[in-house]
Swiss-Prot record:
Family annotation (Gene3D superfamilies): Aspartate Aminotransferase, domain 1, Type I PLP-dependent aspartate aminotransferase-like (Major domain)
Family: Belongs to the class-III pyridoxal-phosphate-dependent aminotransferase family.
Sections of the chain in a coiled coil: none
Region feature Disordered, mapped onto this chain: 36-56
Reaction equation(s) it catalyzes: N(2)-acetyl-L-ornithine + 2-oxoglutarate = N-acetyl-L-glutamate 5-semialdehyde + L-glutamate
Subcellular location: Mitochondrion matrix
Cellular compartments per GO CC: mitochondrial matrix
Keywords: Amino-acid biosynthesis, Aminotransferase, Arginine biosynthesis, Mitochondrion, Pyridoxal phosphate, Transferase, Transit peptide
Protein name, UniProt field: Acetylornithine aminotransferase, mitochondrial
InterPro entries: AcOrn/SuccOrn_fam, Aminotrans_3, Aminotrans_3_PPA_site, Class-III_PLP-dep_AT, PyrdxlP-dep_Trfase, PyrdxlP-dep_Trfase_major, PyrdxlP-dep_Trfase_small
Entry EC number(s): 2.6.1.11
Pathway the protein contributes to: Amino-acid biosynthesis; L-arginine biosynthesis; N(2)-acetyl-L-ornithine from L-glutamate: step 4/4
Cofactor names: pyridoxal 5'-phosphate
Amino acid sequence: MAFRTALRRVAAVNAAPATRLAGAGAGAATAARRSYATASQLTHPDPTEDSPSGKMVREHVPYMVTTYSRPPPVFVKGKGSYLWDLEDRKYLDFTSGIAVNSLGHCDEEFSKIIAEQAQELVHASNLYYNPWTGALSKLLVESTKASGGMHDASSVFVCNSGSEANEAGIKFARKVGKVLDPSGSKVEIVCFQNAFHGRTMGSLSATPNPKYQAPFAPMVPGFKVGTYNDIAAIPSLVTEKTCSVIVEPIQGEGGVMPATEEFLVALGKRCREVGALLHYDEIQCGLARTGTFWAHSSLPKEAHPDILTTAKAIGNGFPIAATIVNEHVASKIKVGDHGTTFGGNPLACRLAHYIVGRLADKQLQEGVKAKSEVFLRGFEKLRNKFPSLVKEVRGKGLILGLQLSEDPTPVIKAARERGLLVITAGTNTLRFVPSLLVTEGEIEEGLKILEESFEAVMVKA
């Protein structure tokens, strides 16, 4: 029953748009007579209720809180840029776990480290030192400075997830504000429209989207919302009452929207003027995804942050995150101000130490830039072939967005049923965040499937 309901939901979503995908034009009637690819013609038709995947979903769904609406495939294996489902069908993955698996699925050394460290020490708590928390912190600080980013990076708080990293940043900012102004008035935190910083109450309060906030209102007080890339509004937005400004150099969930250099420089300058902290959330766009170690690594020092948060790629699928701060922040944080039970455990930190070392490699970063060009050339061809459907290409490196004129859900389904996994972002945007080790051949393969998916959906329309 649950699987049938899930299938009905998917079908309803894909059948819902009454609007036609623009571009069918005068040939729409003729094109419509050509049958849309049937299940027998598709290479990866969604599993049926009676398939192994369908049976597993039907068994498990009643016991799972419905926080996600998932398509039918059940993935059981991954390697490099590919996933395999329960029916042993191979999918090219351009999502990498939502910008998580930057080294691809089941990297050999990554898997080896898990096995080795699990036999030595997994957890002993933060009441004691271990060899890897400090080693990871040192590597993060040194790699950050060497990259040209956050020139005064000083120390690191290690935790488990992006939301936790941002919560730490929010707490640290409030503490600094109270130290600087004991009256308690310097507590406001500025965030921006279309931002996404997490789902716990502090990070959610910095995520001004009614879809996420409304069911859990009221939010944590003291958050102000500004318009992304609006330089003129900064002086009135960031004031003496501001303790922190939290911003993504590239908004991921918000539609793959890059901040301009001028905007980030102006934010940094204003923060210094009023004694506020600048907090960059690079959870999705950081760690080599843009072709530099951090998305802000190419910015001048006046645009560097006081707080820098990272997660996702730092664990390549294993739960770990970090909040990097400068000495101005670190000097205000005392024993007992914050903590974490599992954060900084030796297994997670040893894995992250390996991953950060790989992602800090200049050759890998140059490879990201080269692969980005392959995507961009392919996207330009798609834009020329489907001008009324593909409106804009955004992003940098291997965090890219294709702005469509219509709901991309049918395209995502058509691509999945042809063996390609892509996801959405913002409004009508296809998001591409593949493994940073994706090959040019795999990119070309994915672009071909994407083109076929556009054609199939337009025929159906």
